[in-house]
């Protein structure tokens, strides 16, 4: 889908210029409501959102007259590696950061090279960096960038969605149909609601108010459920914050994948196979309370966000010393050229391998045809011999 450039909208245009302007990281075109749950978690700490900043184009963001925009940077980064580092006008609070290779590059060095030089310096100015998972922390530490394990900002979601429900219900979010049916058969006389975080529809930034209402509706559903079974981090972690008993399912029995590292320990966990075999340590009739381990992370996250907002409003956050625009462009151009060279090298190697395989196939086909002809000749001779 071709992206049409759009002016960054203001959520709450102010009649007077405030002492500080605040930005909110969002994904402009969205098909996973989990991204909006992350944005909602950051929004609760801001006096207002003066700017919505497109996560995938954070480098090209421009504020009015270049004014500083104080922004909590909790998000999944490097899905669009060409768009790092953030624009100079963004004054960041780096926490709940997740860096991942995504699908843009196939080689490890092509991914992490954007954390060298200016890309890494953008983080070093604000050390230590709050990392959502241990794998992200290890990646940054390998680049000599100091970190701390912050967990996800959704751990701070407020428990404000409690309401009376006519009949008890449970939720199964983004799980296999077999899991949903097993839960229905084993949870007693409780309605089981199926939830999809990715429903196939794409919502644009012009639907922001509608997207926020959808997040609040989803969180209301989760907070009032008897329990939740899910494969989604951005279901499981909000349920921790909301106090709803939750079981996180993942195919990796070690729970050591990039996204789960350090976070799975906060949750009740099982594989789908363990659940279906009745081996999960999670009673659907009397669901266990969530582990309290996340509370220390929640407290520090709240402290960091409030201190950041207070300092921004007080004007005590100094302007950083930044490279010139020319230096940034030259650095990014060099990184892009290097990445392109690597990709072209990979393409050339793939083409050579394809040529080799094609030649092997042609030789195999030729050998097969020769064998078939020989078999035909032998069969014909056998037939002649029988007639004699």
Predicted segments with their positions:
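Active-site anion-handling motifs in enzyme catalytic cores
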Residues: 3-372, 376-383, 387
């Amino acid at each position: 889908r071709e992206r049409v450039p759009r002016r960054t909208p203001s959520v709450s245009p102010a009649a007077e210029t405030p002492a500080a302007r605040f930005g909110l990281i969002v994904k402009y075109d969205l098909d996973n409501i989990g991204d909006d749950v992350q944005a909602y978690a950051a929004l609760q700490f801001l006096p207002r959102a003066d700017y919505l900043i497109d996560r995938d184009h954070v480098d090209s963001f421009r504020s009015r007259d270049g004014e500083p925009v104080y922004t909590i940077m909790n998000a999944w980064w490097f899905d669009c590696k060409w768009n790092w580092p953030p624009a100079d006008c963004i004054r960041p609070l780096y926490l709940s950061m997740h860096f991942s290779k995504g699908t843009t590059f196939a080689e490890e060095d092509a991914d992490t090279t954007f954390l060298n030089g200016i890309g890494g310096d953008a983080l070093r100015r604000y050390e230590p960096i709050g990392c959502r998972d241990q794998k992200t922390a290890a990646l940054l530490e390998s680049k000599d960038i100091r970190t701390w394990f912050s967990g996800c900002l959704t751990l701070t979601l407020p428990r404000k969605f409690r309401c009376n429900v006519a009949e008890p219900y449970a939720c199964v979010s983004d799980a296999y149909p077999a899991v949903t049916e097993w839960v229905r058969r084993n949870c007693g006389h409780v309605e089981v609601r199926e939830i999809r975080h990715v429903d196939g529809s794409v919502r644009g930034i012009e639907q922001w108010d509608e997207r926020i209402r959808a997040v609040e509706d989803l969180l209301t559903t989760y907070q009032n459920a008897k329990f939740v079974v899910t494969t989604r981090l951005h279901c499981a972690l909000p349920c921790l914050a909301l106090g709803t008993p939750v079981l996180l399912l993942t195919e990796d029995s070690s729970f050591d994948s990039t996204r789960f590292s350090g976070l799975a320990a906060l949750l009740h966990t099982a594989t789908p196979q363990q659940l279906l075999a009745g081996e999960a340590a999670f009673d659907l009739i009397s669901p266990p309370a969530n582990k309290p381990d996340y509370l220390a992370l929640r407290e520090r996250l709240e402290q960091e966000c409030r201190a950041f907002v207070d300092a921004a409003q007080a004007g005590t956050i100094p302007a950083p010393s930044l490279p010139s625009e020319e230096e940034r462009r030259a650095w990014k151009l060099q990184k892009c050229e290097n990445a392109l060279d690597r990709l072209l090298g990979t393409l050339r190697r793939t083409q050579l391998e394809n040529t080799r395989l094609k030649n092997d196939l042609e030789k195999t086909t030729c050998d097969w045809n020769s064998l078939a002809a020989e078999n035909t000749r032998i069969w014909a001779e056998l037939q002649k011999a029988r007639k004699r």
